[in-house]
Amino acid sequence: LREIFSLPSPPQRIEVFDNSHISGTHALGAMIVTGPEGFQKNAYRKFNMDDAAITPGDDIAMMKAMITRRFRGAETLPDIVLIDGGEPQLNASLAALKEAGVTLPVAAIAKGPERNAGRERFFMPGKPPFSLAPDDPALYFLQRIRDEAHRFAITSHRSRRSRALAVS
């Protein structure tokens, strides 16, 4: 990962961000943390996206709001931030980090054509989009942590939606 993302050393803390909603309802952002010891579930976070300023279903605005909330006044910083999304989500995340006064390596991972696993495209500031070889072990690791962020976001969204339905 150090070489892939031009990091000064192997990352000890990686934070991965994803959004979940159904047509903008019960919108939620999720952050997972991983490192050499594996997933650090006690560091996972959920971000309720009930902000009236965010248009329901606007994944880009949701990502920016989540990154802003995570890094405003943050004491613990990751070695790299991975965003589940493409170039628009990457740009929103970079803008949020800049507003928070935080400088970190950031990359976005988007599923490839037809959303096929193994054809992911990576986006980084100042670099053209790139892919990794389908048999690259780093690709498998990055898919796994992206999928864990997605799982956590979906599970949290379903739980939030179920609670809302139980109340109504």
What residues fall within each predicted segment?
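Acidic, glycine-enriched active-site microenvironments
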Residues: 1-168
